[in-house]
Design a protein with these regions (language model features):
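Conserved nucleotide-sensing/catalytic segment adjacent to the nucleotide-binding pocket
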Residues: 79-80, 87-195
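Walker A (P-loop) phosphate-binding loop of P-loop NTPases
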Residues: 58
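Post-Walker A helix-loop "phosphate-sensing" segment adjacent to the P-loop in P-loop NTPases
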Residues: 70-80
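ATP-dependent NMP and nucleoside kinases share a basic, alpha-helical "lid"
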Residues: 142, 146, 198-246
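A glycine- and Lys/Arg-enriched "phosphate-lid" helix/loop adjacent to the NTP-binding pocket
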Residues: 102-105, 156-162, 223-268, 294-297
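Conserved lysine of the Walker
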Residues: 61
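NTP-dependent small-molecule kinase module
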Residues: 2-44, 228-231, 241-249, 265-298
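Hydrophobic positions on the alpha1 helix immediately C-terminal to the Walker A/P-loop
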Residues: 64, 68
Length: 298
């Protein structure tokens, strides 16, 4: 494809209910870089192929996946975009609460294991919970001594939950990818933000040669069936700058949200060696050694 088709305003996108895809010039420039290499890799394979577009918060997974699918369809390669965000075990609100519960339960167990539970600490911790400040360092040296133990234990527990089968039904996603490879009809889950907003749509595979899975966890070790993982990389500093710019008042995330993002970033880094394409935040394809150097300096 010598010239890339213009992107219409009503471009089809993923299947997450209520998802908003806002494509800008930056997304298009990155897709232009990815697309030729993607076509090369697809040419090396045979049969139906699954492409995963993964990365952390704010890297443009949904937008870039939509552009790649649009161009593939224009070239006659029938392509469908599927969002992995439909497959957590809980709706977003309940999953946020479960993340917090796991963190706090883990933190409490850490205090118990160290023999640090007292009525005074229990009362202070309850106050911090009510203020959503238990993931923040304390300005009091005495308080920080036990709060640091709580945070470390909570973070350890949260790491064991985020992006694991406890949080996400990876088996269902892997099953969908297996059905796609076989050419069977797909039953795709739809999850909204309320308990009643849950259903399945049937999708025929006839005429579909590529499936693009756009998802933070698209390169996870728990997932099977991905042929071409694409990592849209972002360093921790770049992620922080993006989220700060997105907040109208320029504030940063809460300490707990920042912790969640840091843990997800570490997991993405641990899985990055499997990516067939790694794209930097600046829109450059990175080799594995270049990626390692970039993240080491981050």
């Amino acid at each position: 494809m010598k010239q890339f088709p213009a992107i219409p305003s009503d471009i089809p996108h993923g299947d997450m209910p209520g998802d908003q895809v806002c494509i800008d010039d930056g997304h298009i420039r990155k897709a232009v870089v990815i697309y030729p290499r993607l076509r090369e890799l697809m040419g090396e394979g045979a049969g139906r192929q699954v492409i995963a577009v993964c990365g952390g918060s704010g890297v443009g997974k949904s937008e870039i996946a939509s552009i790649l699918a649009y161009w593939l369809n224009r070239e006659g390669v029938g392509t469908r975009v599927v969002s992995g965000d439909n497959y957590p075990r809980r709706i977003p609100r309940d999953n946020d609460l479960e993340r917090l519960r796991v963190y706090r339960q883990g933190g409490l167990r850490g205090l118990v294991d160290r023999g640090l539970v007292t009525p005074e600490i229990t009362a202070r911790l309850r106050a911090l919970w009510e203020e959503d400040r238990d993931a923040e360092p304390s300005s009091s040296a005495d308080e920080e001594a036990w709060l640091a133990v709580y945070r470390r234990a909570g973070r350890r527990a949260l790491t064991g939950y985020l992006g694991t089968p406890a949080e996400i039904d990876f088996d269902e996603v892997s099953g969908i990818l297996a059905r796609f490879h076989r050419g069977d009809d797909l039953f795709l889950r739809r999850m909204g933000r309320e308990p009643s907003a849950l259903w399945y749509d049937r999708a025929a595979c006839a005429g579909t040669e590529a499936l693009i899975l756009e998802w933070t966890h698209g390169n996870s070790d728990y997932l099977e069936g991905v042929d071409i993982p694409i990592l849209l990389n972002s360093t921790p500093a770049e992620t922080l700058a993006h989220r700060r710019a997105r907040n109208r008042d320029g504030t940063t995330d809460s300490a707990f949200t920042a912790m969640v993002l840091e843990i997800e970033q570490k997991k993405l880094e641990a899985q990055a060696h499997k990516a067939r394409i790694i794209l930097s935040k600046q829109g450059e394809i990175l080799t594995w050694p270049e990626y390692r150097r970039l993240m080491a300096d981050a």
